[in-house]
């Protein structure tokens, strides 16, 4: 190989062909080192060889555009377990995920967020141990299968958002580690920090964000996903361990912050309309401020200020111990001026593992498919789809997947049939959230007012709107109590007939739901809850009503 002035090396191999395997042999004073190309688009295994890959692909007919962020509904999934193959010894692959796209389309989601697919050690993993970030996991089908999957998803009207890991690499099967044999303090060498800045919860493998070659490497990776794979958005894992050393915000890492700014700035410049999402969970509003204003420039961020109080509210065994003030704060929390710069959820891969379980399982450990589990988990889901923010659910949540998430246990699709009514409940909520029928535009709007909160009776009501008026104003009333509440008087923002668009107690969702006699109501003049009109509603136990004009 020949050295270039910028520190890069190159070689022309006229006899090389697509599909050929290769490796770099690096000879230094430290010895000889066999290394996989850090930019390899395909590898045989995480410890094998690089493969010469043709990045070309027939994207003809793929003119997909991501929905506006206030109209996104995200479905997080893990390729290896979402729809496992018949061969139980191997993980699921992209083609097996493709066979379930019809389910997702019918459910109504318009974006899939895929847990990391960069080549990792072994065949089964969550994906957060990337060995080769430019190569698609071969056990999932490799790069061609991933492109085919993305094109198929786009044909179904579904965006693909990819989870990437830049807060650390590896730590196992990591050829970048001491790449040329050099290191200090027995750390990672030229591409990593070689002091305490290298230390993360996952190993001493934090890349050196202050090194130009490393920054370019990570930017090139982001741009590869957007260009070669036509990914519609990027979710950045644990950004608190990029912008700080200890993840707690007390040891800032300026190199990491400027890296995030640069990556987001480049995405916005080169691919306007694509979304970038931070998983930071430190309720830091600067993450979603514009780079020009000193922020990191993310489009949105996962919101710990929503998921934790909502889960706490529905998993608390005794009604009297539920905090409606915490629910109110979760509904109303916002980082900056945009209600949709947060992603809200009651389940994610982290929230249903690491010592935690699926919401129905936590509600009723001995009866996770029972009445209490179904009623209160769907109560949480209703909050996800009616509160301001970008709603997200985790694979299998729509049919009461139980236990906790593991990369060796596939989703139980038999429950899709067994709990078809709960699936319909999710489908109806998503339809309302996206205003598919043209009478709930307010759920896509910026404005929210929680105007009624009765902590003793455990009832909360809030108003959502965009511009206001007919087909826009939405009122959500939620009962976090085990008993029905009849003739319950609350305020309404406008007079006239308010149509009942959704009742989570409908028996069509589950045979043992009560179909409590809730109906359209007429709001009459009379100041109530600070609003000029009022009406009496009837709520089933642990139920949500959605009204609109």
Q: Where in this protein do the model-derived segments appear?
A:
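Carbohydrate-interacting/catalytic domains
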Residues: 1-71, 80, 90, 95-105, ...
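Substrate-binding/active-site clefts of carbohydrate-active enzymes
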Residues: 43-44, 64-69, 78-231, 235-252, ...
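Conserved, mostly hydrophobic/aromatic
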Residues: 24, 77, 104, 114, ...
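Soluble or luminal CAZymes and related metallo-dependent hydrolases
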Residues: 96, 142-145, 213-218, 255-259, ...
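Conserved alpha/beta catalytic core and glycan-binding cleft of carbohydrate-active enzymes
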Residues: 43-53, 230-232, 246-406, 434, ...
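Short, flexible loop/turn elements at secondary-structure junctions
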Residues: 15, 78-83, 118, 137, ...
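Short, contiguous acidic/charged loop-to-helix segments that flank catalytic cores in large enzymes
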Residues: 133, 137-141, 209-210, 249-254, ...
């Amino acid at each position: 190989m020949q050295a270039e002035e910028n520190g890069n090396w190159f070689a022309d191999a006229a006899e090389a062909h697509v599909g050929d395997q290769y490796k770099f042999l690096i000879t230094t004073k430290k010895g000889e080192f066999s290394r996989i190309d850090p930019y390899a688009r395909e590898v045989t295994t995480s410890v094998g060889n690089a493969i010469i890959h043709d990045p070309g692909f027939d994207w003809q007919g793929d003119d997909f555009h991501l929905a506006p962020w206030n109209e996104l509904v995200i479905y997080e999934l893990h390729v290896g377990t979402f729809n496992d193959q018949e061969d139980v010894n191997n993980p699921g692959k992209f083609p097996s995920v493709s066979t379930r796209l019809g389910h997702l389309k019918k459910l109504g989601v318009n974006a899939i967020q895929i847990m990391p697919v960069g080549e990792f050690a072994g065949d089964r993993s969550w994906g957060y141990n990337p060995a080769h970030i430019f190569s698609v996991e071969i056990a999932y089908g490799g790069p061609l299968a991933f492109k085919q999957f993305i094109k198929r998803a786009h044909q179904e009207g579904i965006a693909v958002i990819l989870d990437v890991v830049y807060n650390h690499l590896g730590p196992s099967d990591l050829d970048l580690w001491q790449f040329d044999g050099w290191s200090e303090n027995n750390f990672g060498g030229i591409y990593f920090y070689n002091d305490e800045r290298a230390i993360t919860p996952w190993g001493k493998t934090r890349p050196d964000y202050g090194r130009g070659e490393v920054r370019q490497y990570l930017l090139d990776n982001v741009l590869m996903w957007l260009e070669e794979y036509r990914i519609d958005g990027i979710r950045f894992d644990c950004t608190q361990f990029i912008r700080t050393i200890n993840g707690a915000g007390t040891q800032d890492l300026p190199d990491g912050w400027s890296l995030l700014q640069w990556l987001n700035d480049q995405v916005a410049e080169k691919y306007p309309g694509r979304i970038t999402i931070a998983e930071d969970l430190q309720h830091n509003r600067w993450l979603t401020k514009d780079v020009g204003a000193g922020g990191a420039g993310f489009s949105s961020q996962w919101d710990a200020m929503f998921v934790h109080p909502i889960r706490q509210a529905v998993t608390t065994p005794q009604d009297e111990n539920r905090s409606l003030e915490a629910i109110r704060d979760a509904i109303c929390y916002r980082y900056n001026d945009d209600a949709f710069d947060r992603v809200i959820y009651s389940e994610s891969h982290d929230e249903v593992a690491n010592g935690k379980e699926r919401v129905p399982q936590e509600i009723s450990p001995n009866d996770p498919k029972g009445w209490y589990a179904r009623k209160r988990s769907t109560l949480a889901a209703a909050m996800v789809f009616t509160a301001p923010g970008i709603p997200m659910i985790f694979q299998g949540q729509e049919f009461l997947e139980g236990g906790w998430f593991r990369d060796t246990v596939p989703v139980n699709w038999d429950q899709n049939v067994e709990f078809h009514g709960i699936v319909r409940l999710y489908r109806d909520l998503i339809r309302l959230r996206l205003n598919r029928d043209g009478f709930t535009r307010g759920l896509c709007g910026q404005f929210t007012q929680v105007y009624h909160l009765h902590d003793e009776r455990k009832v909360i009501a809030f108003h959502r709107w965009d511009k206001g008026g007919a087909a826009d104003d939405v009122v959500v009333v939620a009962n976090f109590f085990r008993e029905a509440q009849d003739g319950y008087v609350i305020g309404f923002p406008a007079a006239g007939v308010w149509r009942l668009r959704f009742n989570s107690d409908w028996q069509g969702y589950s045979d043992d739901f009560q179909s409590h006699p809730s109906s359209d109501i007429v709001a009459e003049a009379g100041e109530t809850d600070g609003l000029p009109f009022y009406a009496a509603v009837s709520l089933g136990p642990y139920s949500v009503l959605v009204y609109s004009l």
